[in-house]
UniProtKB/Swiss-Prot annotation:
GO terms for biological process: trans-translation. Its main location: cytoplasm. Belongs to the SmpB family. Transmembrane segments: none annotated. Required for rescue of stalled ribosomes mediated by trans-translation. Binds to transfer-messenger RNA (tmRNA), required for stable association of tmRNA with ribosomes. tmRNA and SmpB together mimic tRNA shape, replacing the anticodon stem-loop with SmpB. tmRNA is encoded by the ssrA gene; the 2 termini fold to resemble tRNA(Ala) and it encodes a 'tag peptide', a short internal open reading frame. During trans-translation Ala-aminoacylated tmRNA acts like a tRNA, entering the A-site of stalled ribosomes, displacing the stalled mRNA. It comes from Shewanella sp. (strain W3-18-1). It comes from the Bacteria. It is found in: Cytoplasm. This is SsrA-binding protein. GO terms for cellular component: cytosol. It holds the Pfam family SmpB.
Length: 163
């Protein structure tokens, strides 16, 4: 019997900001569209994007992503002056922008891009997280917990094969 493919395909991840999940504790995540130029889309298709030093700020009621490096391709950007660190406007609804603005201004939250992925094969989306920075002891606790999970899985696997 042949399985039917689900109508919702898993989004294809382009880039992930691993440092963000280590340095921040996210309380809420949301999806935002990106306003991009043609050469940026071509570079993203080739995987020439880096989210590691990236953050989101709000200005004049709009959200912008700063620090996202998109390296231009030599073949795709011959007639356009390319700025790899250009500000990218995030496409969010007014309700989402107002919610973000309230939390950032009043409660000291940060907005950090977590990952970039393709939605429906043609749209580049960014998963942004709303959270606060972790303290050093929180980072150590997370590292210990992660190491314990790995060790526990190793012991369970060993028990399963030998016992």
């Amino acid at each position: 019997m042949v399985k039917k493919k689900s109508s919702k395909a898993a989004p294809a991840t382009i880039a992930r900001n691993k440092r963000a999940t280590f340095e921040y504790r996210f309380e809420e995540k949301m999806e935002a569209g990106l306003s991009l130029m043609g050469w940026e889309v071509k570079s993203i298709r080739m995987g020439k994007v880096n989210l590691s030093d990236c953050y989101v700020f709000l200005k004049n009621g709009e959200a912008f992503m700063h620090g996202c490096t998109i390296i231009p391709l030599n073949t795709a950007s011959t007639h356009v002056v390319c700025d790899p660190l250009r500000l990218k406007k995030l496409l969010l609804s007014r309700k989402e922008l107002d919610k973000l603005a309230g939390l950032v201004e009043r409660q000291g939250y940060s907005i950090i891009p977590i990952s970039m992925y393709w939605r429906k094969g043609a749209w580049v989306k960014v998963e942004i997280g709303l959270g606060k920075g972790k303290k050093d002891h929180d980072k150590r606790e997370d590292t210990k917990a992660r190491e314990w999970e790995v060790e526990k899985a190793r012991v369970m696997k060993k028990e399963k094969t030998h016992g």
